[in-house]
UniProtKB/Swiss-Prot annotation:
The active site is at H99, D102. This is Xylose isomerase. Mg(2+) 1 binds at E230, E266, D294, D337. One of its GO terms (biological process) is D-xylose metabolic process. Its cofactor is Mg(2+). GO terms for cellular component: cytoplasm. InterPro entries: Xyl_isomerase-like_sf, Xyl_isomerase-like_TIM-brl, Xylose_isom_bac, Xylose_isomerase. The lineage of its organism: Bacteria, Bacillati, Bacillota, Bacilli, Bacillales. Homotetramer. GO terms for molecular function: magnesium ion binding; xylose isomerase activity. Binds 2 magnesium ions per subunit. Keywords: Carbohydrate metabolism, Cytoplasm, Isomerase, Magnesium, Metal-binding, Xylose metabolism. Its EC number is 5.3.1.5.
Length: 435
């Protein structure tokens, strides 16, 4: 069955195109800094928002019109796979991501859930072979079912801990089966609502124990996969242990996991943590831990995870600049963890929204490439820190100074002159690259 009969494959037509179903900026084969756009951007579509989100919210019923159905839950799951791969092919996107519960019903037992996953991943595997589309990452949903109300790896219930381990094990089996290059952990319920009844050290140690089991199991089945943790400060849990990039790196370092994990960073999660997305990316780069990103944007006027499609060129420019400075994002990618607005309820909006996001990231890439070629930020930073290039500054960096010698220097040079940062000019010049 064809779900988008009236829509042809989305092609690049240029900025003058009036065709809604065409890329105006994303030209997959266009070479930027020696690589094609599709190599730089490594776009992926998220199964959950694309196939299971229905447009409902806490105040209103579902609005999304989706021409996919089934007489049983499994028939619906199979039909969703067909529709999903049609979307990927229409967009020319080469990667996808999913949670286990996105693709198959849980049934009445863990055993039934695993059988359902086997059947659906057989179908997905066939579609991957037919299309050449690849799995960017998968993960286990350890937050929706009521059993996870007190967490999965951080739970106070040993039976829940065992169930969670079984679900992760199956996720890694599926990752190997489908050739996944990354596996994600997002701890939506790994945290606390009150410290009054929480042993934080115990819970975090159990989380680390679970991660180490995952590493060992991946080695046992000879599956080379990049493990990723996705930070988020809150929602659904009041305080989540993977609050932001820096907090997550502190956790990984404490438990000796920093060489086994990188970060999957999401723009809207950065907003909730009180950071810009480029801040989180820069922190991850500092730790050599930038693994993959979830592309979306939040609303600064709202206090929750709105998961909007990215349309802000300023943000995507600074995002792509960090990725270029990182030497790229592979084997990770740019996954659109974004959902259409409740008012964008038609089937075609799924394609239009992804086109908007892909075009916005393409514009960000081109602007970031120009910033890189011009050494725009490099020159500014070189000038700003030039006092450390010679004299006392150079000696400090060479570890030739100590408190005594620096005190002697300060006493002899106590008339200090600072220089203006001219930051308004810098921001204005940055705008020149965003055309």
């Amino acid at each position: 069955m064809t779900y988008f009969k009236q829509i042809e494959k989305i092609n690049y037509e240029g900025v003058q195109s009036g065709n809604r179903f065409a890329f105006r900026h994303y030209n997959p084969e266009e070479v930027v800094l020696g690589k094609s756009m599709k190599e730089h951007l490594r776009f992926a579509v998220a199964y959950w928002h694309t196939m299971t989100q229905d447009g409902s919210d806490p105040f209103g019923a579902a609005t999304n019109v989706r021409d996919v159905s089934g007489k049983t839950e499994m028939e619906l799951a199979r039909n969703r796979v067909e529709m999903f791969f049609e979307i990927l092919e229409k967009l020319g996107v080469e990667y996808f991501c999913f949670h286990d519960v996105d693709i198959a019903p849980e049934g009445n037992s863990l055993q039934e859930f695993m059988r359902n996953l086997d059947e659906i991943t057989d179908l997905i595997q066939d579609k991957m072979k037919q299309t050449g589309i690849k799995l960017l990452w998968n993960t286990a949903n350890l937050f929706t079912h009521p059993r996870f109300l007190n967490g999965a790896a951080s739970t106070n219930n040993a039976d829940v801990y065992a169930f969670s381990a079984a679900q992760i094990k199956k996720g890694l089996d599926i990752s190997k089966k489908l050739g996944g290059k990354n596996y994600v952990f997002w701890g939506g319920r790994e945290g606390y609502e009150s410290l009054l009844n929480t042993d934080m050290e115990f819970e975090q140690a159990n989380m680390a124990r679970m991660y180490k089991m995952a590493i060992r199991y991946a080695n046992e089945i000879e599956h080379e996969v990049q493990f990723l943790i996705e930070p988020k400060p809150k929602e659904p849990t009041k305080h989540q242990y993977d609050f932001d990039a820096a907090t997550t790196m502190a956790f990984l370092q404490k438990y000796g996991l920093e060489n086994d994990f990188k970060l999957n960073l999401e723009a809207n999660h950065a907003t909730l943590a009180g950071h810009t997305f480029e801040h989180e990316l820069n922190v991850a780069r500092t730790y050599n831990a930038l693994g993959s990103i979830d592309a979306n944007q939040g609303d600064l006027l709202l206090g929750w995870d709105t998961d909007e499609f990215p349309t802000n060129i300023y943000d995507t420019t600074l995002t792509m600049y960090e990725i270029l400075q990182n030497g790229g994002i592979a084997p990770g990618g740019i996954n659109f963890d974004a959902k259409v607005r409740r008012t964008s309820f038609e089937m075609e909006d799924l394609l239009l929204a992804h086109i908007a996001g892909m075009d916005t990231y393409a514009r960000g890439l081109k602007a970031a490439a120009k910033l890189t070629e011009d050494h725009f930020f490099d020159k500014i930073k070189e000038e700003r820190y030039r006092s450390f290039k010679k004299g006392i500054g150079a000696r400090i960096l060479d570890n030739q100074e100590d408190f005594k010698s620096l005190t002697e220097y300060a006493l002899a040079h106590d008339s200090i002159q600072n220089e203006s940062s001219h930051i308004e000019y810098v921001k204005s010049r940055l705008n020149d690259y965003l055309v």
